[in-house]
UniProtKB/Swiss-Prot annotation:
Region of interest (Leucine repeat I (LRI)), ranges: 52-115
Chain segments carrying region SAW: 404-479
Gene (name only): SCL3
GO CC annotation, single: nucleus
Database matches in PANTHER family: OSJNBA0084A10.13 PROTEIN-RELATED
Extent of motif VHIID: 165-169
Entry's family note: Belongs to the GRAS family.
UniProt region (Disordered), positions on chain: 302-324
Name the UniProt record assigns to this protein: Scarecrow-like protein 3
Region called VHIID, residue ranges: 134-199
Length: 482
């Protein structure tokens, strides 16, 4: 990974990322480096030195939080607050959001204090702001553009010759994807099909805006078109609301949605563990079950780490554990399989942020968000208010959820393509390799974006979008096995 470091004279120079350097160092004992140094001396550190120092502080702070040593965690947070900055260089900006997340996690350990501090704060669902931030992400990163292109290409190839097509969008928040599909269908030699799009979103206003844009474009192209809005959270969706009709060729598009079901699976697993203990208390580890029942299943193994400075051996990592045998994820995928789609295209974060311990998630998410912040650093000025909005309202909120939340509250449970492939395969789907033409178009799109650090890697017929060598997102296509 390569990062841009801005010198005092305002020019930029390319240097090794602090995380790249840090990854070659020993992780056995993260300690407070020069903990007695005056804060004013810390300000004089060179960018790379400061980046390394911030990483050590974050890991040390997280280690103290995990072990319950809150006084030491507070000391680390104080140093972090003097070095981290939401408008500084890449590592300072990342550290600012991880620092906030760790502090928030500490506050949550005192529910009374946490609730009292938040009692007078009102959360407003500003729909226009949410749409604006999603649009900024779409414009600043090529991720969604590539996802939409590959999804549309898979749909077009699956629907060749079909006269009635129904597309279900499980996150109907961005009309750009379907505007492009309308234009592509209009260019078919045999003419466009009758197209029906069902959009699922929890906010009515978002669906209304999408419907207006798509109906307007369909009328302009003279394509027979219907839009079916479904106002619902995905985890509350009843498949009957999708109104799938006999004779329609069905396609399903899921962009960054399936991972939200994993929180329900974790909640179900904790309840099942508690039930097994009630039925057979002598056969279950009492301490672990009690910890799970208090909403911290992922904390059940934190004590095992205290003698290893907060780092779990690789054999304990979440990626090596078997998939849950049942849950909301399986039920939802089974329900989609029951609709018999000709193709289902899934885009997900290709990261392992669903580790069972805080330290696992912190390390993995540090690397992922460092790559995402690097992407912005190479293209968008540091003073850009739009960049700050994306970092704070999108990435910052994801980081906070990954680090400070547990149990059902922790919804940003990103996992690797390998695990999603296992789940989808078990639900009765077979992989449809993305076509050579689709991959060629996607690579051309990346080249046209002017982001030299992006590349697309093919993995078992799927596309993995990377920044440098770091996988960020995956796109895979599936069809029902008979």
């Amino acid at each position: 990974m390569v990062a841009m470091f801005q010198e005092d004279n305002g020019t930029s120079s390319v240097a090794s990322s602090p995380l790249q350097v840090f990854s070659t160092m020993s992780l056995n004992r993260p300690t407070l480096l020069a903990s007695s140094s005056p804060f004013h001396c810390l300000k004089d550190l060179k960018p790379e030195e400061r980046g390394l120092y911030l990483i050590h502080l974050l890991l040390t702070c997280a280690n103290h939080v995990a072990s319950g040593s809150l006084q030491n965690a507070n000391a680390a947070l104080e140093q972090l607050s003097h070095l981290a900055s939401p408008d500084g260089d890449t590592m300072q900006r990342i550290a600012a959001y991880f620092t906030e997340a760790l502090a928030n996690r500490i506050l949550k350990s005192w529910p009374g204090l946490y609730k009292a501090l938040n009692a007078t704060q009102t959360r407003t669902n500003n729909v226009s702001e949410e749409i604006h931030v999603r649009r900024l992400f779409f414009e600043m990163f090529p991720i969604l553009k590539v996802s939409y292109l590959l999804t549309n290409r898979a749909i077009l190839e699956a629907m060749e010759g079909e006269k009635m097509v129904h597309v279900i969008d499980l996150d109907a928040s961005e009309p750009a994807q379907w505007l492009a599909l309308l234009q592509a269908f209009n260019s078919r030699p045999e003419g466009p099909p009758h197209l029906r799009i069902t959009g699922v979103h929890h906010q009515k206003e978002v669906l209304e805006q999408m419907a207006h844009r798509l109906i307007e474009e369909a009328e302009k192209l003279d394509i027979p078109f219907q839009f079916n809005p479904v106002v619902s959270r995905l985890d509350c969706l009843n498949v009957e609301q999708l109104r799938v009709k006999t004779g329609e060729a069905l396609a399903v598009s899921s962009v960054l949605q399936l991972h939200t079901f994993l929180a329900s699976d974790d909640d179900l697993m904790r309840k099942n563990c508690a039930l097994r203990f009630q039925n057979n208390p002598s056969g279950v580890d009492l301490q672990r079950v009690l910890m799970m029942s208090h909403g911290s299943a992922a904390e059940a193994r934190e004590n095992d780490m205290s003698n290893n400075n907060g780092y779990s051996p690789s054999g304990d990592s979440a990626s090596s554990l078997p998939l849950p045998s049942s849950g909301r994820t399986d039920s939802f995928l089974n329900a989609i399989w029951g609709l018999s789609p000709k193709v289902m295209v899934v885009t997900e974060q290709d990261s392992d942020h669903n580790g069972s311990t805080l330290m696992e998630r912190l390390l993995e998410s540090l690397y992922t968000y460092a790559a995402l912040f690097d992407c912005l650093e190479t293209k968008v000025p540091r003073t850009s208010q739009d960049r700050i909005k994306v970092e704070k309202m999108l990435f910052g909120e994801e980081i906070k959820n990954i680090i400070s939340c547990e149990g059902f509250e922790r919804r940003e449970r990103h996992e690797k393509l390998e695990k999603w492939s296992q789940r989808i395969d078990l639900a009765g789907f077979g992989n449809v390799p993305l076509s050579y033409y689709a991959m060629l178009q996607a690579r051309r799109l990346l080249q046209g974006c002017g982001f030299d650090g992006y590349r697309i890697k093919e993995e078992s017929g799927c596309a993995v979008i990377c920044w440098q060598d770091r996988p960020l997102y995956s796109v895979s296509a599936w069809r029902c096995r008979k």
